[in-house]
Structures are given as structure tokens and as C-alpha cells.
Amino acid sequence: MVSKLSQLQTELLAALLESGLSKEALIQALGEPGPYLLAGEGPLDKGESCGGGRGELAELPNGLGETRGSEDETDDDGEDFTPPILKELENLSPEEAAHQKAVVETLLQEDPWRVAKMVKSYLQQHNIPQREVVDTTGLNQSHLSQHLNKGTPMKTQKRAALYTWYVRKQREVAQQFTHAGQGGLIEEPTGDELPTKKGRRNRFKWGPASQQILFQAYERQKNPSKEERETLVEECNRAECIQRGVSPSQAQGLGSNLVTEVRVYNWFANRRKEEAFRHKLAMDTYSGPPPGPGPGPALPAHSSPGLPPPALSPSKVHGVRYGQPATSETAEVPSSSGGPLVTVSTPLHQVSPTGLEPSHSLLSTEAKLVSAAGGPLPPVSTLTALHSLEQTSPGLNQQPQNLIMASLPGVMTIGPGEPASLGPTFTNTGASTLVIGLASTQAQSVPVINSMGSSLTTLQPVQFSQPLHPSYQQPLMPPVQSHVTQSPFMATMAQLQSPHALYSHKPEVAQYTHTGLLPQTMLITDTTNLSALASLTPTKQVFTSDTEASSESGLHTPASQATTLHVPSQDPASIQHLQPAHRLSASPTVSSSSLVLYQSSDSSNGQSHLLPSNHSVIETFISTQMASSSQ
């Protein structure tokens, strides 16, 4: 009999009394153990079952009592479980078997969680994997790990097997280091135990002490020589011996954990491979085009024929959102020197302004991006790349008088070329174009329409490094002075006929905040051939457009008829006809507001009537000799 009950016994007694069992019935059941022990097959009443619980409580402090052992021998599957390591005690000498049983009995009497932490610390100190414990004891790997790491309860029989292995391993390791210090064979003590380990040797595992030494050496030298590796071997083995609490002279007792020169070589090789892999992974991560706002990259200035430049990355432009996927178009541009054609292929991204209907778009996939000898093109999605024209395009700095034409289906940059090449260069079938002409004697910022919502809303200034010559003093481009002599041209966007019309379903045109932003000359014409735009005299014409009556508009004709614009020139040799590539649609593409077109001969007051604040008109400058033959 024990003089004092444990906490578990006290809780069990309290549970028995709370279940309705009286103290007298409990004492009576304890006084009659015979019927209780033989009642395993028959039905038991409360007194007998509770008495059985009390009978087991008396033997709990012994730890290895027969009653408790019979309880723990039953595994989860209901079968008797006897660890194989306990059966091996019979093979030992009686003195050794008695010693191990005594030590295991002592460990079983202690706190299981404290003993579990002690066993785990020993495994870490000697770099012993849990697999070796599982192979020797027959315990479940998961159950053993949870017991050592979290203190999960384990039955006494299984804990006895774990503690038996722990005691035996301590003895085995001590013998290894002892024989290593004496110069004897270290395999003799473990030779008889090889069958219990299922013939498997422990895999080498780097200890924390050795890893610290190796990482410090790797920082100094990533590929040490053989002499340096041998020095590291001695340092690692010394650290491993100190970690185990033995003398460095007994390093041979480390067994499978002995550090060798080959293992050090492999460790450094693996570290170099890992570093190279991480470097390659980082390079692959940052090698792609960096996403973010800003103008997309321009086409390379030194593109060779037949080699398409890299695709333009889509850029986020203020007021513009990207819609349909990009398609690629190819345009052939005659060079100014009469050389071979230069073919450039670049994607035109379908974009739509924020104020436009989903069915509309600013840049159609039908357009072509034309590049000439003047230099690289600005991105298709925006004209703001012209800000960096001086820094990024030396070729354009030398020839600042390039004509930049922008129509809604596309954007074109045309450099100085031969007169014969102007015709195919300026041909942009299927679109009308808003062309802004300039005449000034000073270097100035040219406004370029950058973003379009329900109307032309944003004027983006573009700084030119050299002054533009006035129309009555110098020609725009000497090679083509007989065809374009009145003024230099800077082009921006507009569209009067297209399935993706800009002003469809918009009641009125919004105003500009500034009325003097644009220079002196603006005209609306078809751009199939601009060679006839010469020697135009100033006057004023007013075109009115109605969304319902297309016959009243000078800009709309029925779909079954074609429109021809005749622009006479002072030079009879340069008189040509501008034929639109497509028939103008009768569908409402412009609001019912009137379209007033001016041209002023005086350059000083020309900006005062351009784009007034009235929402119902757009005032631009146009020639008097432009006529519309609406049929």
C-alpha cells in the first residue's frame, strides 16, 4: 500500500465517487478482488468495474507491474505488442540485462516529458537520426517524433523500449570512443548488433558545429585547395568531438559521422552549385521587361532590313486603357537615299480612351507603323516619347524638320525623302487625317494631341531644338519643296470616317482650356497624297455636319458614293486629286455641331480664333482652294 495517492489516482477516485458509487460500495468491491478478476467474460456491475479501476491504481507507482503491463501490451490494433529490443535482453549476460532493466525502471519512474527531452538532446548531440531508433525499437516514426518534440503520451511498454535503446546506445557510443582512444577496433562492440539494425548504416549528417566552420571558410574561399580542406577536416572533427564531450584524439569514435576530405570537397561543390542556381534564378527574374507606367521603348534606330525589332511593350498612358490583344502589322518604307526597302514589324495595341464607348478605339489594327530614315519612331500608344527626342534620337536632332503625321488608325513618322517617295509614304488607306501646319521663326513647343476621351482633351507640348522656318522664307524639306512649300507640318490625330469613329454617340465637343496653344495653320484633308498641298491662299470656309442629314455635311456622303477632294496649286504640274481609299459612311460620326475652318494670313492673330471655348464648334485653319464635291 502507498501512503500517499498521486494526482492521477486522486482524480480517478473523485471520478468514481461522482459517478454515483458510494464509498461503502467501493470499499466492499476492493475487499472482494476474486470475483472482480474472474468477471472478464460476464457482465459487470458498477461496483465491480470501479473496483477493477481501484485495483490497478494500487500498482501504478511500480511502473512495471503485471496489471499495468497487461494494459500497455495491448496495442491500438488490439494485439499484444512486445518491442523486439526487450526480447534481446535475454541474449545479454545476466549482469548486463539486470543493469539495463534497473536503469530503464528508473527512467520510467521519472517524468516522461523530461526523459523525452533528454533523449532528444542526446540524438542531436551525436547526430543520430530517429530512423535508427525506429529500426531498432519497432516504434512508429510519427508517434516517436511527437513524443520527443511535443511530449505526446506513450504507453509504458513503448517507453520502456525507447529507454532501453537509449541506455544501450549510450553504452555503445562510450565503447566506440574508448576503443578509438586506445587504438583498438571500434567495430567489435557493434558486430553482434548489426542484425538488429537490419543491415543499414547511418547516413552521414553534418553537425551544427561543423557547418558553422564550413560556412565561415566558404565566405573566405569558395574553392579551397586540398591542404585547406584537410585543415577544415581536422577543425570539424575536433568540433564534433567537443560537441559530444569527448577528447579530440578520439575522433575515430565518431563512426559514420567522421568528417573526411571528400565530404568537405562535396560540401563546397554543393554550395557553389546552389549559389550559381540562385544567381541564375535572380537573373531570370529580372531579365524580363520591367512592368510599370511610362512610354514604351522606341524602335531601334539601327534596324537592319529583314530583322524585326523587339516588340513594343504595352505602356500605361494617361487617359488610355488597353483593350483587345495586339496584332502585328508590317510596313515597307522607301528610304530617302533610294536604297532597299526597310521592313519594320511592330504590334499595334488596340486602345480606347476612358470616355469612349467599348466598341470604339483610337488605334486600329488596320493601321501601319511607318519608319523612315529620320530616326526611331515614338511608341504607337502615345506621342509623349517625343519629349526625349533630343536625348534619345541624335538623328532627329540633325534633321528636326521631320513631318510627323498621326491618324486615328495609326501613327507615322516621315523623314526627309525623295519627292517620288512621298506618295507611298503618306498613303494611309481608310482614314481621314487632321493635319496641323506650323509657321514660326523661333524654337517652340509644339502641342501634340496625346489623349482623347469624348473629345480632344489633352495637348501635349513637344519641344523642338531648332526653330521651324516660316512658310514664306524657307521650305520645309528641300528635296520636296516643289510639292510642300507653304509651311512645315506637325501632325496630330482625328478621324472623320471609320467603323471605330471617335465622336460617335457624343452630343457635343468639349472645349480646350487654352485657346492659343496651336500655331497658325490647320487643315483637314485626306492623306492619300499630300503632294498637292501647295500654294494655298488664305480664306475661310464653314462646313456644317448633322448626324441625321448626311447630305448637308461637307464631310459625309452616302455609302454608295465616293468623294473626291480637288486641291489646285499655283503650279499646274503639281495639281493632283486626293482620292479617299474608302467610301465615307453615312453613319453619324460627328456630332451635330458645326465645324468652322479658318486660315489667317496674319501670323500674329492666327492663334486667337483657334479652338475657342464654345462647345459646339471646332475652329481650325484651312485653305480656300479646298472644295468638297458632295454628290
UniProtKB/Swiss-Prot annotation:
A motif (Nuclear localization signal) lies at residues 197-205. It comes from Homo sapiens (Human). Keywords: Activator, Diabetes mellitus, Disease variant, DNA-binding, Homeobox, Isopeptide bond, Nucleus, Phosphoprotein, Transcription, Transcription regulation, Ubl conjugation. The gene is HNF1A. GO terms for molecular function: DNA binding; DNA-binding transcription activator activity, RNA polymerase II-specific; DNA-binding transcription factor activity; DNA-binding transcription factor activity, RNA polymerase II-specific; protein dimerization activity; protein heterodimerization activity; protein homodimerization activity; RNA polymerase II cis-regulatory region sequence-specific DNA binding. The keyword Transport does not apply. This is Hepatocyte nuclear factor 1-alpha. Changing S142F: In MODY3; reduces transcription activation by about 80%. Changing E132K: Abolishes transcription activation. GO terms for cellular component: chromatin; cytoplasm; nucleus; protein-containing complex. Belongs to the HNF1 homeobox family. Residues 1-31 are annotated as: Dimerization. Residues 325-353 have a biased composition (Polar residues). Changing S594I: In MODY3; pathogenic. Pfam families: HNF-1_N (PF04814), HNF-1A_C (PF04813), HNF-1B_C (PF04812). It is found in: Nucleus. Ubiquitinated in s SPOP-dependent manner; leading to prteasomal degradation. Changing F268C: In a hepatic adenoma sample; somatic mutation. Changing R583Q: In late-onset NIDDM; uncertain significance; also in an individual with hepatic hyperplasia and familial early-onset diabetes.
